[in-house]
Amino acid sequence: MVKINQDLLNSIKEFTLMDDPFMTKVFEDDIERTQLILRIILENDTIKVKKASTQKRFKNLQGRDLQLDILAEKADGTKFNVEVQNESSGAIPQRARYHMSLLDAKSLPKGEYFDKIPENYVIFITKEDVLKGLLPIYHIHRTIDENGHSFADGSHIIYVNAKIHNDTPLGMLMHDFCCKNPDDMHYKKLAEKIKYFKEEKEGLDKMGDVMEKLIAKREKEALEKMAKKYEAKAAKAQKEARISLAKEMLANNESIDKIVKYSKLSVKEVRALAAKMSA
């Protein structure tokens, strides 16, 4: 476990619920607080969460696996997947569709009739207004093109715009999701848990595991970035060498086919070089 020194303590104080590692810790196995945010987002105070977990991995034997930020479930099997996204690219419609598909696949036991599949929800809380409608929340449902009627298949995709902070319950929740100081938060239950992880010794000790994973993740990302940088440089150098060879062969009046064969450039690229050299 990483020992919490002053530098790490300062980093922890900068966390908000929009930061995946911190959000994961705050909502880990926390039915009460998961239920709180679902009731606010869905404007339904009757929602009763039976199970809640974070970083739940969904295996897909024939495709890409998913690791869900928050997964909650009601007694009737209804599932809620809440994802926090700081990057707009991580909240594209196709991703929401894929999350829903796996959520549905995990909701119907073998041999059950299709009408037994429960209603399911995929909720993206996004740092930016991804759908660009200047709205605080977007509800997406399938409709019949010809008459505009609801298809009513029980799937619900919701985008919450975390940029809008106002005096509505949702606006205050988004303020709290973006707030660093628990003393400035609206919802006491969230503030208490955040204060625990940011200020109390027991909570800070538990944050050591989070920081260890975060440091490892950042080191991995740095190495991957460095590898991509050198791969790009190598590719550029290789391209330049091929162009140089092609120019030399053109100067020696070699055939286009021969130049393409040895330089690995395309016919179009070789012809463009030839035109440039003869201009």
Identify the function of each model-found stretch:
Residues 1-203:
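Conserved single-residue anchors adjacent to enzymatic active/cofactor-binding motifs
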Residues 2-15, 80-85, 171-279:
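Short, charged alpha-helical interaction segments and adjacent helix-coil junctions
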